[in-house]
From Swiss-Prot:
Signal peptide: none
A Pfam family matched in the record: Metalloenzyme
Gene transcribed to yield this protein: deoB
Domain of life of the source: Bacteria
GO biological process, one term: nucleotide metabolic process
Annotated organism of origin: Streptococcus equi subsp. equi (strain 4047)
Name of protein: Phosphopentomutase
Record carries keyword Nucleus: no
Main localization (coarse): cytoplasm
Any one Gene Ontology cellular component term annotated for this protein: cytosol
Binding note for cofactor: Binds 2 manganese ions.
Amino acid sequence: MSKFNRIHLVVLDSVGIGAAPDADKFFNAGVADTDSDTLGHISETAGLAVPNMAKIGLGHIPRPVPLKTVPAEADPTGYVTKLEEVSLGKDTMTGHWEIMGLNITEPFDTFWDGFPEEIIQKIEAFSGRKVIREANKPYSGTKVIDDFGPRQMETGELIVYTSADPVLQIAAHEEVIPVEELYRICEYARSITLERPALLGRIIARPYIGEPGSFTRTANRRDYAVSPFQDTVLNKLADAGISTYAVGKINDIFNGSGITNDMGHNKSNSHGIDTLIKTLQLPAFTKGLSFTNLVDFDASFGHRRDPEGYRDCLHEFDRRLPEIIANMKDDDLLLITADHGNDPTYAGTDHTREYIPLLAYSASCTGAGVIPQGHFADISATIAENFGVDTAMIGTSFLADLV
């Protein structure tokens, strides 16, 4: 008999809560991540009013300095803590895979100086299109289309770029390079980056529209991941006949492995919340896990180093949190967390090595408060214990703390 019939895991992509102990080993533009603090710096510099997350207990998460504008509520309704990453990476895939119980000890390859000429030439030969060499380096996804979009519109060349993550991204104007053609090229790029010297976590198709000076990336993004190297708790659940529902890019991150129901990509955070609520309302969803990723925090504001936009995005989620809770059953459990940091006030443009917050709420819990600090994989270990399946590689359940 499960303690909770349904568990809903919501990842607020990049919403870190302070530098991790090993942040000195991770860098942004040559600056160690040691002073990164996504939530803390947003609260400090832009102001942060998230009363619904505060009510669950966000302000109670232990920190060297309390969140400036998020109070520690006198009577929180949920359990909270912060979790540390053990894997050797700070990218989306590593974070999500570890949350589901894997320890990534050999990181994927990153290309600070751009991809080898061998890879670029193979993409050119397959696609019949030239690649803009000047874009072949770590680049902000919005800046790269601002810088090279006009040229692409004139020449039809491909914009191939990377980031601090182990990813190869191809940006293409939808009126110049049709989306289906872009997808085919990305599928090929995936096939040639499955082993070293270019072992990549993801290939990302990045379609955009508009005119020079006002380009906009569209919702037709598509991720081509590799399957996890070992079974995650998602696989354990699916193998036991327990439903797993993926909302947003979760299906892409796990390459469909262990996902029994893909609810589709999100056009925005708000659309993703709508999809999550529809998932909660499904008559067939009586037992199992829903797993949601809301990416706008990261993609639209973290990488762009926009603390005010990031703040507003957090406000939007917080305003809609009561809707999510209202569609839960009394014996449901809501887990809100993140996958890494992306401090919008920090140096560089890439992720930051941080603790992630964990908020746990269920109407069936009569207690509340701070539970012991743990690690990312403790989330999947808790889910596994609840549903009576084995854990994956790592993780310690905190199910007994939720009373």
